[in-house]
Amino acid sequence: RGLGDVYKRQSLILRKGFEITDEEVINKIGLPCFIKPNAGGSSFGVTKVKTKEDIQPAIEKAFEESDEVMIEAFMKGTEITCGCYKTSDKEVVFPITEVVSANEFFDYGAKYNGESQEITPARLPEDTAERVRLLTSAIYDILGCSGLIRIDYIITEGEKVNLLEINTTPGMTATSFIPQQVRAAGLDIKDVMTDIIENKF
């Protein structure tokens, strides 16, 4: 269906009580990398690690937020996110948002203190944007999602689409991505929520 290749960045999961050496992280993932809790939201406990000395403190920090920690390779590219919902008679994939963070990554400050620029629709070539929309819809179906979801990607050199994260309970504050995308689509969030609720009954 024109999805093209989809990439997933190199990652490791650690559970509490499991130890990993600095050398293992460097050999398997490389530096810089992200070390973050594998649960929760708002980028609490996330560290961008650039040096060997920072690996273990970052793991400890992440374990304060979750019993599982994820170590992910760093990717340089354009961060985007795309929301979607489906009912029995319609499919809605929202305009894509591009995230330009003033910080090292899209952390709590960038999310909630206005330290980022969010551009909807994203500045992507149309064929790349269409691939992202098709991919978002396909993932929704593959996972059997219901209600609203939001999927985060990074577009790297050569217009490679890299899947980052699937959010099945996306934020719904006024400044969150989904309400922004709903507005950009010329829709009203109340109508969207009514649509989803009525589809349940």
Name each model-derived stretch.
Residues 105-106, 173-180:
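A short, polar/charged loop-to-alpha-helix boundary motif
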Residues 26-44, 67-76:
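ATP-grasp fold ATP-binding core
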Residues 9-37:
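Rossmann-like NAD(P)H-binding beta-loop-alpha module
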Residues 73, 83, 140-172, 182:
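Conserved metal-phosphate-binding beta-hairpin within the catalytic cores
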Residues 23-25, 118, 122, 130, ...:
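Peripheral (often C-terminal) accessory segments that flank ATP-dependent C-N-forming ligase machineries
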Residues 177, 183-201:
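Generic C-terminus detector
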Residues 1-7:
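Short, small-residue-biased leader/transition segments that mark boundaries at the very start
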Residues 50-134, 155, 160-162:
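Phosphate-binding site of ATP-dependent enzymes
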